[in-house]
From Swiss-Prot:
Range of residues in the leader sequence: none
Record has tRNA processing as a keyword: no
Species per Swiss-Prot/TrEMBL record: Lachnoclostridium phytofermentans (strain ATCC 700394 / DSM 18823 / ISDg)
Protein name: Large ribosomal subunit protein uL3
Single GO term (MF): rRNA binding
BP GO annotations: translation
Length: 211
């Protein structure tokens, strides 16, 4: 069975192992989640597991969602996300998913929405080199040339230019699970995960071996 769970980001801290080596970790509140729907190739064209996380009061749920949760026999949830698994049939509607599906040492992928930085210049957005900062220079933090003249007569797609930075879907792969706290539904992951505090993060076992 493929392992996956929804979590919210609490923040970062650091811990020491038995050898005194410091490790930066991200603390996540993972689950408990509920399976609200199991999609199959025959009925939906693809196999996936729909998971709900975070109980909310009934007044925050619209009528179609109320019916959906009632049909699954679960409480109203704040977040609903799908995990596409070939073996989705291993899950059952109403099943509870807890953080103990993972163990210390597992490798997981974390998907979330990165922090929005607003409209930024090309140097901050893409890491371009700046020009001379001397008094006589007329080129400080410009992006430089964005193309030739008549030929090709256009700016190529993907050219590094100023624009909206951040607030996009990001997946960080092969993160190591450092510690599991089953009693408090906490999972400690080595390194950073996308998004600000309280952001919703999708955690699933890694798709790459990392070798």
């Amino acid at each position: 069975m493929k392992k996956a769970i929804l979590a919210t980001k609490i923040g970062m801290t650091q811990i020491f192992n038995e050898n005194g080596v410091l490790t930066p970790v991200t603390v996540l509140q993972a689950g408990p989640c509920a399976v609200t729907q199991v999609k199959t190739v025959d009925n939906d064209g693809y196999a996936a597991v729909q998971v709900g996380f975070g109980d909310i009061r009934e007044t925050l749920v619209n009528k179609p969602q109320k019916g959906h949760f009632a049909k699954a026999g679960v409480a109203n949830k704040r977040f609903l996300k799908e995990f596409r698994f070939e073996n989705a049939a291993d899950y059952t509607v109403g099943q509870e998913i807890k953080v103990d599906i993972f163990t210390a040492g597992d490798k997981i992928d974390a998907t979330g929405t990165s922090k929005g930085k607003g409209f930024q210049g090309a140097i901050k957005r893409h890491g371009l080199s700046r020009g001379p900062m001397g008094h006589g220079s007329k080129f400080h933090r410009h992006a430089g040339s964005n193309g030739a003249a008549t030929t090709p007569g256009r700016v190529f797609k993907g050219k590094h230019m100023p624009g909206q930075m951040g607030n996009v879907k990001v997946t960080v792969q092969n993160l190591e699970v450092v510690k599991i706290d089953v009693d408090n539904n906490l999972i400690l992951v080595k390194g950073a995960v996308p998004g600000p505090k309280k952001a919703m993060i999708m955690l699933k076992e890694t798709v790459k071996s990392g070798k």
